[in-house]
Amino acid sequence: MKEQFDAAQISKVIDQALVYQCACPAQVCRAIFELRELYEYQMSCANDSANDALVHRTIAAATEKSHEVMEECLKKILEIEGWDQVTFTMPQALKKKPARAL
């Protein structure tokens, strides 16, 4: 499955989002990780029959499409919010967000 973001980049977004209580990017990142796990499971699942193989391929194909959509979603979110696309660092404006909300 093609990946735009590696696990370290996604984890960095999750870590920063949790520290600064900015849950939306973290939720998208967690969904991406879950889709990767589902895909890997389907690719390694036992195929005891042609029907099993078809079921697993169908789920894997749908998961791959969903993964692509969610990675594009993450890319757009990071662009909209102004995250650094090289270091995956949260912008200062978002870091101050929780303080204003209190």
Region locations from a protein language model:
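Beta-strand/loop-dominated core regions that host nucleotide or nucleotide-derived cofactor-binding catalytic loops
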Residues: 50, 54-57
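Long acidic/polar interaction regions in large eukaryotic complex-forming proteins
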Residues: 2-11, 93-101
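Generic signature of intrinsically disordered, low-complexity segments enriched in small/polar residues
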Residues: 8, 23, 42-44, 86-91, ...
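Secondary-structure edge/capping motif, primarily at the C-terminal ends of alpha-helices
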Residues: 17, 42-50, 77, 81
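N-terminal acidic leader/helix
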Residues: 5-42
